[in-house]
């Protein structure tokens, strides 16, 4: 139930859905028969606010600023030895169970593949064993892709988790009998900070290993022109900012607590 509520809130609070709903409400007030002057003014204000905010989130100038807020973990320093017992790669970007281009084998999504690639790179560089954590679809895609495309085997699979909180909780249960408490945590750069807080809360010592760090282009006239990539990046950044805020609220109200 909580996952379903979260999914609904994501649709209602994040662009473009939230802003399109706002603009649609404004258009309805404007076009409604018998609408008074005040209702029409409110409608125009809602329509303008929805479209203007959508435009702002779709320009690189704004998406870059949001990205800097969301990406709070620096890249892993590869010049220093990594003090950890395992590498944990998080899901969160579901792949496909039957990809026709791979002869029906599982395949990872682009965002998930980025995490797998970096996790494999770190595994080869450090010699540490690898765990994958996510839904059954995500973990199957990750395990298949790692073995097929990168030649790195997965030692542990945690396939019960549906969100970041459960990633941390179920990984703690998986590793407790093994005495594994120090991990390298591989996930997308905008997700790393929130994920790290959840894993620390579950009792882990975490070495953050963000991947896909955004490097903003040079500012110019194009920085004020909307594009789909900037809107997608703004949406991802807002998702993580709101997700971390929700994590703090849940923790303060003791709604979700890691068993220790």
Give the location of each predicted region.
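Secreted/periplasmic serine-hydrolase-like ester/acetyl group-modifying domain
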Residues: 159, 232-236, 243-246, 257-260
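Small-residue hotspots
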Residues: 24-28, 43, 50
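Extracytoplasmic/luminal low-complexity segments enriched in Pro/Gly and acidic/polar residues
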Residues: 221, 225, 245-260
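Membrane-embedded alpha-helical segments of integral membrane proteins
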Residues: 1-32
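Membrane-interface helix-boundary motifs at transmembrane edges
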Residues: 32-42
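A structural signal for short, hydrophobic/glycine-enriched beta-strand patches
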Residues: 51, 56-230, 235
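Hydrophobic alpha-helical segments of integral membrane proteins
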Residues: 1-9, 62, 66-70, 238-245, ...
């Amino acid at each position: 139930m909580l996952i379903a509520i979260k999914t609904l809130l994501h649709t209602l609070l994040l662009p473009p859905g939230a802003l399109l709903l706002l603009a649609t409400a404004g258009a309805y007030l404007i076009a409604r028969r018998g609408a008074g002057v005040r209702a029409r003014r409110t409608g125009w204000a809602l329509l303008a606010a929805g479209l203007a905010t959508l435009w702002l989130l779709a320009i690189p100038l704004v998406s870059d600023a949001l990205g800097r807020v969301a990406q709070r973990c620096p890249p892993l320093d590869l010049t220093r030895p990594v003090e950890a017992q395992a590498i944990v790669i998080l899901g969160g970007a579901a792949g496909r169970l039957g990809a026709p281009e791979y002869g029906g084998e599982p395949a990872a999504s682009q965002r998930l593949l980025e995490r797998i690639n970096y996790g494999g790179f770190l595994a080869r560089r450090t010699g540490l064993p690898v765990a994958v954590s996510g839904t059954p679809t995500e973990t199957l895609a990750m395990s298949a892709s790692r073995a097929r495309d990168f030649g790195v085997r997965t030692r542990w699979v945690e396939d019960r988790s549906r969100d970041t909180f459960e990633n941390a909780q179920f990984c703690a249960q998986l590793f407790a009998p093994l005495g594994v408490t120090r991990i390298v945590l591989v996930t997308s750069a905008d997700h790393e900070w929130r994920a790290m807080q959840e894993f620390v809360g579950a009792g882990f010592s975490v070495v953050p290993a963000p991947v896909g760090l955004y490097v903003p282009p040079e500012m110019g006239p194009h920085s004020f022109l909307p594009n789909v990539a900037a809107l997608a990046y703004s949406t991802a950044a807002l998702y993580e900012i709101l997700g971390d805020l929700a994590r703090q609220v849940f923790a303060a109200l003791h709604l979700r607590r890691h068993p220790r």
